[in-house]
Regions:
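Transmembrane helix-bundle signature of multi-pass membrane transporters/permeases
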Residues: 98, 102-103, 137-146, 174-179
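Juxtamembrane and boundary regions of transmembrane helices in multi-pass small-molecule transporters
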Residues: 158-189
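Hydrophobic mid-bilayer segments of alpha-helices in multi-pass membrane transport proteins
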Residues: 1-10, 17-36, 57-64, 178-187
Length: 189
């Protein structure tokens, strides 16, 4: 069995097949050779039972909401309001980045979407205010991580579905730490 495994794996890698695809093909080949259970039926059952969960319907809606906020200009107006609210703080624009990331995280549910949206909106402010680009982008990257913690979080939904944990309890468990983390980010700036 080991000889067949290594031969198939090395053959796929020699053909310049990507490692992930090679391991997937290797798993299929080995399951057909050595397993009595049909793997294709098991894959179909797992995919169907996972996608048939009504809680996962929320994920595309969070993505759509984030896109609506960006395309409609609401994210830009939110960021502009935050820029006007915190200029009295030292590093006011950095605090605007973190606060905007926290507010957008509360609507999008995704760290990547939060960092990308606020980064897109905020990039024009670097030249206007003369901040260090490293520090400016660092606050956006740090604030973007709030998207996974501040509810509603896509990762919390997926975790709750997979572990059969109450999603409202996960949301309650993430809210206070998210606010504390945003406050600590602002304190660090």
């Amino acid at each position: 069995m080991l000889a067949v495994t290594l031969t198939v794996l090395l053959g796929l890698l020699a053909l310049a097949v990507p490692v992930a695809a090679g391991l997937g093909v290797l798993g299929l080949v080995l399951s057909e050779l050595y397993s009595k259970l049909p793997l294709t039926l098991a894959i179909g059952e797992i995919a169907w039972s996972t996608s048939n969960n009504f809680l996962l319907v929320a994920i595309p809606f969070f993505v759509m909401l984030g896109e609506i906020l960006l395309r409609s200009g609401i994210a830009e107006r939110m960021y502009g309001a935050l820029v006007l609210w915190v200029p009295w703080l030292p590093g006011g624009l950095m605090h605007s980045n973190i606060a905007a990331c926290a507010m957008f995280a509360a609507t999008s549910g995704s760290s990547v979407a939060t960092a990308a949206t606020i980064g897109t909106v905020a990039m024009g402010e670097i030249e206007k205010h003369g901040y260090s680009e490293r520090l400016f982008l660092g606050t956006i990257a740090a604030g973007g991580t709030l998207g996974i913690l501040i509810p509603p979080s896509i990762n919390m939904i997926v975790y709750g579905v997979l572990t059969e944990t109450s999603i409202p309890q996960l949301y309650l468990a993430g809210f206070i730490p998210g606010i504390i983390l945003a406050s600590l980010f602002s304190l660090t700036v």
